Structure formats: structure tokens, C-alpha cells
């Protein structure tokens, strides 16, 4: 079986297992987005190129996006309190520099998968800035990516004909 087909099989199996596990955990209050965050991280792993470097880059930039989102929220709160702006307008204003930083950090190899930073920001905000569920969701999803890729490689090796047999 070629590598892409084998990886497709293992991705499907891993996605199904992730859905099973995360949907049960997601029944607990505050954990509703665990499945979504994990699936996005799963995609982020492959989009960052897969393998060891894809895992490292994806996870690092997902986490950096969370940190920038946290600082953006703190800055928006501060700006609203000192300026009299509404929280909405303070958030709009602080989105500009913190979004730019996510792009600018891309000059560094570890943070060069720029979309991953925006995924981290977005899902951290979507979770209500829940550090635990977002950190664990990104870690689990990237790990599921590694497992599915490795499984695909092993399945391909086990099912590929060798020496003409």
C-alpha cells in the first residue's frame, strides 16, 4: 500500500478514536472545545510539514498564539480602563499589533508556521481563555498527528511488496 493511502487509513482511525475520547471528555463543563482544538492541532501538525520538525513547529506556534492572545486580552482590558473605550473597541484596537506580532515571529524557524499562531490565538479566545483545555487540546492533537503519520509509515512498509514478490 502506498504511503498516502496507508496514512489516510491511520488518519481515519486516529480521528475516529480522537472523536470517541474527546466527545466523552467534552461532556464536562469547560471542556466542550477539546475535540475541536485537538482536530485543529491534528491538521496543524500536517500543515506544518509533519514529522519531528512539524510537531515541534506546530506545537510551539500554537502555544505562542495562545500567549499573544492572552497579552492582547490583558492589553485590551488595560486600554479600556485607562481610555474610557468600550471593551469592544479596545479589543479591535489591540487586535492590530498582536496579529502583526504573530506574522513577525515567523522570521524564526520555530515559529515560522504562521497560520498555527492564528489557530492558537483563535482557539484560546474561543475556549474562553481556558489555558488547561487549550494547552492539552493542542498537545493531544499534535500527538495524534504524530501517531497517525507513524502508523501510516508502518502500515505502508508492512503492506508494500519487496523484491518483486
Curated annotation (Swiss-Prot):
To E.coli YcdZ. Keywords: Cell membrane, Membrane, Transmembrane, Transmembrane helix. The lineage of its organism: Bacteria, Pseudomonadati, Pseudomonadota, Gammaproteobacteria, Enterobacterales. It is a multi-pass membrane protein. Pfam families: DUF1097 (PF06496). The chain crosses the membrane at residues 30-50, 65-85, 86-106, 108-128, 131-151. The keyword ATP-binding does not apply. InterPro entries: DUF1097. It is found in: Cell membrane. GO terms for cellular component: plasma membrane. This is Uncharacterized protein YahC.
Amino acid at each position: 500500500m502506498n504511503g498516502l493511502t496507508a496514512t489516510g487509513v491511520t488518519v481515519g482511525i486516529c480521528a475516529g478514536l480522537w472523536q470517541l475520547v474527546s466527545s466523552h471528555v467534552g461532556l464536562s463543563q469547560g471542556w466542550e472545545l477539546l475535540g475541536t482544538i485537538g482536530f485543529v492541532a491534528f491538521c496543524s501538525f500536517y500543515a506544518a510539514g509533519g514529522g519531528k520538525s512539524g510537531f515541534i513547529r506546530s506545537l510551539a506556534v500554537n502555544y505562542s498564539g495562545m500567549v499573544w492572545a492572552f497579552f492582547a486580552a490583558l492589553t485590551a482590558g488595560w486600554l479600556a480602563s485607562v481610555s474610557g473605550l468600550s471593551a469592544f473597541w479596545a479589543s479591535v484596537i489591540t487586535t492590530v499589533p498582536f496579529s502583526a506580532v504573530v506574522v513577525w515571529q515567523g522570521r524564526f524557524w520555530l515559529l515560522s508556521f504562521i497560520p498555527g499562531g492564528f489557530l492558537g490565538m483563535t482557539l484560546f479566545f474561543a475556549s474562553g481563555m481556558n489555558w488547561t483545555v487549550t494547552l492539552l487540546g493542542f498537545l493531544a492533537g499534535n500527538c495524534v498527528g504524530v501517531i497517525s503519520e507513524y502508523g501510516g509509515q508502518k502500515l505502508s512498509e508492512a503492506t508494500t511488496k519487496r523484491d518483486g514478490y
